Amino acid sequence: MLGKTAGSLYWMARYLERSENNARLIDAGFRIALTRSNTAEAEWRSVLVTAGQDGRFRQAHGEDYSSQRVVDFMLRDPANPSSILSVIKQARDNARTARTYLTREVWEAVNTSWMTLGALLKRQVRKDDLPDALAAIRRQNGQVRGALTGTMLRNDGFHFAQLGTFLERADNIARILDVKYYLLLPSVAHIGGSIDNVQWETILRSVSAHRAYRWLYGAEISALKIAEFLILYRQLPRSLAFCCERVEEHLGQIQRGYAEETEAGRMAAALCRDRLSAPIQAIFDGGLHEYLSGFLGATGALARQVERDYRFVE
């Protein structure tokens, strides 16, 4: 497969995952804003920081972190290349470039998503309509994901797409935890004790892990358990451990298909071995913020190495 085609499949999947992750962040911010009007603007800024969009937002709107302005910026602002509308278009453009490597079902799902969400976000989304709009974004992404896993051959094209998905997801989870890490520190909440219900629920809901956490831990809420669940629990599809294992798995499949070991493959193996083998208490003892910063640095370096090894840009 040409590097350009592999890169298009990889970025198609990354952009689709990014649009869904941002929709979940907006939903979490919206829930907090409904219950805590006195701190709503601080929470909306936190959403922008997590999504990596705060700098661009402040350039355009200064310190006005009102709900409607932030939501509109993240959903549909044409001047924001990371808005959901923008990344859906980029996903569709990449899918079109690699169209001959996609099944008809995958292409139609991506194209339908672009048309449906383009129509939905053509106008400003009112506050009362926001939950339905965010649900539609998640639903469209689910249809693409279903078509991808249900109809694609398990060849290099599939593995490049999955690699993009899980690298993007790992980056997103680590950013959420890094922005919110102060909530999990002993200075704010005793390790093993309870922390603010609205805030921890926001963390879990923003990664679709609220109900799964309840199934596993019941009503017991603690900083240590939340961090352990989202970092080390390998059965959770949005934990760092799960994402890293999938990255290593799909890179391994690509390497076997090409009969060639790469630096990216070695880096992925090291990421799983070095970053996910310590127990959660050791991670806290060493500094949660430092751990997450190191993880983000490692995944960023891995993503850049993937692009070099497989010549996404000639």
Residue ranges of each PLM-predicted region?
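Alpha-helical transmembrane segments and their helix-helix packing motifs
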Residues: 1-314
